[in-house]
């Protein structure tokens, strides 16, 4: 694996902290939702770490009421604002706010001149057709370094998908000259932490 020792330590820290909070979410979220009103868009401030990322879909905040897909397929308005719908959403999308706005990378804090992309920047969209990898590193304005590592390992009709560090694949291929193209108005303002290994994904020949 193309990770440096410091990056491995960063990853271990992320996993330990987030794993603890994810376990706590099963206790905290059911209680926190008792303090929410129907028209609320967020959990009470003291519980904010346990809501999903504060992203907007169709002009509506997804923090506790779900994104557009959730509203379309599972709980259409206004049923998405019921206790049950919110509970299911938050237990499915645990500590998104923490992973995004506390430990995540704020796009405005990235030094565009520091971005380095190694490997195939399009690896995330090949549907597992070919094995490969991409690693993106950057330095924040405060000097801290962040990385995102994505790897696909194909075997037969299936493949293993690995994504570690921060979701920097969103800026794969970016540099000081084109960075603004990766930070449009409707783009996410924070890039989450990630530690995901899916060993059994079916190859999609369409590359999706």
Spans of features found by a protein language model:
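Short helical patches
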Residues: 5, 9, 16, 27, ...
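A transmembrane-helix-recognition feature enriched in membrane-embedded lipid enzymes
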Residues: 8-46
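Membrane-proximal soluble helical/coiled-coil segments
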Residues: 80-161
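Compositionally biased, charge-rich terminal segments
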Residues: 1-21, 69-83
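N-terminal topogenic membrane-targeting module
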Residues: 30-114
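Low-complexity, compositionally biased segments
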Residues: 42-43, 55-61, 123, 173, ...
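Cytosol-/stroma-facing membrane-proximal "stalk/adaptor" domains immediately downstream
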Residues: 133-208
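Acidic-enriched, low-complexity/disordered segments with a strong bias for Aspartate over Glutamate
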Residues: 18, 22, 39-40, 52-58, ...
